[in-house]
Every structure is written in C-alpha cells, then in structure tokens.
From Swiss-Prot:
Chief location category: host cell
Topology versus the membrane: Single-pass type II membrane protein
KW Transmembrane (keyword) present: yes
Name used for this protein in its record: Uncharacterized protein R387
C-alpha cells in the first residue's frame, strides 16, 4: 500500500475511535440521567411520606391532654428521632444529587422541601413544651431556604443571611413556646393544677436554655448592624421580652426556674 492509503486508514481508525468514545460517553450520560431521575423520584416519595408523618404527629400532639403520660411522651420523642434520622439521610442524598439535577427539578425539589419545613415549624411550635424535642429541617439547596422565613426577618447585606435567619428562627421558636404555654394556662382559669407544674418547669428550663444561647451570640451580631436594623431587631426582641414577662407573671410561683430575658443591646 502506498503512503496515501495508510493516511486514509489512520484517519478511518481515528474516526472509529472517536465514534466509539462518543457513544460510550452518551450511553454513560444517559444511564446517569436515568439514575438521577430514579433517585429524584424516590426522594420525592420519601419526603411526601415524612410530610404525612408530620401532619399525623401534629394532630396527635394537638389532641393531647397536658401533662401527657410519660409513655406517650417517650413514644412521640422516639417518632421525632426517627423522622430526624430520615431527614439527615435525605439531606445527604440531596447534597450529592442536587448539582446534577436540571434547574426545574432543583426548583421543584426546593418547593417540596419548603412545604415540609413549614409543617415542621408549625409542629415544633405546638409540640416543644409537650415533648421538648424538635423536628429537624431540610436543606432546600441554593434555590430554597433551610427554614421558613418570617415577615419580620431582619435583612442586612453586610451580615451573613443565615446568621440573621437563624436568630429570627430562634425568636420565632421562643414565641411559639410562650404562646403554647399561655394557651394551656388559659384553660386552667385562676389556678394552676399540680399536674401541670412539672411540664411548666420543663418548659421554663427549655426557654432559659434557648434565651442563654441567644444572649451568647447576640453581641457579635449586633455590632455589624446599622442603626435602623438594630432598632428593628430591638423592637422584635422587646416584644419577645414582654411576652416572656407576661408568662413569668402568669406562672408566678408555679415554677422554681425564673424565666430569663433576652439582653437588648
């Protein structure tokens, strides 16, 4: 064979190798898409199932008579722990899968996770003083928020958004606990029964732990707020302190733990 024939043969071999490489990569990509779709659909089903568990748990706790029997409280706490374990597992799966999902699926997944988070927040607000255990939240990724946002959330471009959101979430949680306890107290009229004092004691201890956590981290955050933002934050904290003070007066001597206040800077 002459030199020209060898050139054609080499070119043909190169073309064949390129075609083989292309089809192998195409099939691999297609397989990856199928795996991602299967994982995505499985995640959707798992999250939907957890959402149903959340709603059922919320109904159970709403119907409880305080103080609930210890066996009931322990059972509910175990259910919450099981849900949190599943949330943790799914969060890890989302972290691995999310970068490979198309934008529309990322947005859809974030929406589903946000619905769960809102339901979890509602449940936490009514259940905290009963079982003293929180449902964890999903990470909704770059297209969603980890926790439901409140209309009073203070925004500051010079401070990390997650710091402010976490602080606001802590305040919202405290407001939810205070509101729940006051609703129970309203049912008792002028006197607080002995049967409720133990639960009130636990709630007061829980509130103080959360207030101490806020007080510990607040000074560093406040230093980075502008005057207007600081005023807004102080207003929110003042409202919280007023509610805490009112609850403290309502409980009176029913609890040994004195409920603390948030330090306003």
């Amino acid at each position: 064979m002459d030199k020209k024939t060898w050139v054609y043969i080499i070119i043909a071999i190169i073309i064949i190798l390129l075609l083989v490489w292309y089809f192998r990569n195409h099939m691999s990509d297609q397989k990856g898409v199928n795996v991602n779709n299967q994982t995505y659909n499985m995640l959707q089903q798992q999250i939907s199932s957890l959402n149903q568990q959340i709603l059922f748990l919320k109904q159970q706790i709403s119907n409880l008579h305080v103080p609930a029997p210890t066996s009931t409280v322990n059972s509910l706490r175990q259910t919450v722990s099981d849900i949190n374990q599943q949330v943790s597992t799914i969060n890890n799966q989302i972290s691995s899968l999310n970068p490979y999902l198309p934008r529309n699926q990322q947005l859809e997944l974030a929406s589903v996770l946000s619905i769960f988070n809102r339901n979890a927040l509602d449940l936490n607000n009514i259940s905290r003083s009963v079982i003293n255990r929180d449902i964890n939240y999903f990470n909704a990724g770059q297209h969603g928020s980890q926790v439901p946002q409140n209309s009073h959330t203070v925004q500051n471009p010079n401070v990390a958004d997650n710091e402010l959101n976490v602080l606001q979430q802590k305040v919202d949680n405290l407001n939810g606990v205070v509101s729940n306890i006051r609703q129970h107290l309203a049912q008792f009229g002028s006197g607080i029964p002995e049967s409720f004092r133990d639960e009130a004691e636990k709630a007061a201890s829980y509130l103080n732990d959360r207030i101490d956590d806020i007080n510990k981290n607040l000074p560093n955050l406040v230093q980075r707020l502008n005057p207007n933002q600081r005023n807004n934050l102080n207003r929110i904290l003042s409202e919280l302190n007023n509610d805490l003070s009112s609850l403290k007066n309502s409980l009176g001597s029913a609890v040994r733990n004195r409920i603390n206040s948030v330090n306003i800077h």
